[in-house]
Amino acid sequence: MKRVYFQCRDNRRAYQDDVVVLAEGLRAIGVEVFGNCNYWQRSLDPRDYLVRHDPRITPDDCDAFVVSYGWTRWMDTDFKSYLQPIPEAAFRAGRRYRTAYLDYEDGYHSGSFAPEYRRFDAVFRTKYNERCFQPANQIPWAMGLSPRMIAYTADALPWAERARDILVNFNASHPYVHSGRALMDRHFTPKVARHFRVNTDRDNLKEAPADPLDRLFFEQTQQRHSRSFYARLSRSQAVSAFCGELAPAAPFEPYYLQGGGRRARYGRKFFEALSVFDPRPRRLIQWDSWRFWEALAAGCLVFNFDLPHYGVKLPVMPENFVHYIGVRPENVDDALARLAADPGLAERIARQGRAWVMEHYSPAALARTFVRRLESLPAPC
């Protein structure tokens, strides 16, 4: 694969995190990147864009045509959705390029569940759960790391010099609390507070940074990924990275997660009642967040849900008590006791987690996985 064409939303405020990570990785492994617009200013040079628009280059000149979820559906900070149709080039008859859709949408039932998305060669879906129905062309994917995350955590303090803090300070998130976080705030946070100091410090997201480059990124990311946040990560030993919702084990296609209304409410109540008699574990929906990847990159001891137990699927899975600590509401005491019994275990897991995420989820690593998966599919007709 030599060239990739991205379809991006031409809006400086529209943070297309999927494009940033993948395009940076593709460029790092020698793949040229073009697009329908200039996207993601990388420096204070107004000509320095990650994705470049060249009117001489069209999708027909490239090996892959990639549509960002930010193109079809973008949600601003007002939490209103702005929709656009799938570009004609995605399904053009006689095309010689492969097509991919990057789906980072929250929730279970994302836009890419619609029938027209089956025409993409592949849909790379974050928040994938193998114990739920997922359309046939969806491929498990991950948010991974951006070069900025790696750079801002590169000088993280050695373990022994860090504060014995656990960060529980979700910031750039939804205007509501994830039910999974609320659950673990009851079952996990009071218990882990006996082992680490709970740090709830947050940034003021309404206050733009003074540094011009930081301000540029502040504006392009809808106020995410601040330098001060990475500094806190880099001097803290542990992070709480719980996210999403633990849904009942049935049904296989949980329609009650597809929206509000009376039908969804009744469906949820029915299957919640049924789950009392269902021995299968619950399923973790919308689990993926930047917090998990950022904390691993910073060399922190990361606490999250027990990912495979709840059905989470990634291109490369982390191993519990090797790369992170995966817990369930009912076994928090056991996990913390295991940590306490081995004084060096927390540091080892943090170190191994950092090495694991750099090996498999750096931009270049994700780009190689993307290219390999896309090229393994049948050639376009």
What are these regions, as identified by a protein language model?
Residues 2-90, 94-316, 320:
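Nucleotide-sugar donor-binding catalytic core of glycosyltransferases
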Residues 21, 85, 183, 331-338, ...:
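Alpha-helical elements of Rossmann-like donor-binding domains used by nucleotide-donor carbohydrate transfer enzymes
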Residues 295, 324, 353:
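Hydrophobic, well-ordered secondary-structure elements that form the walls
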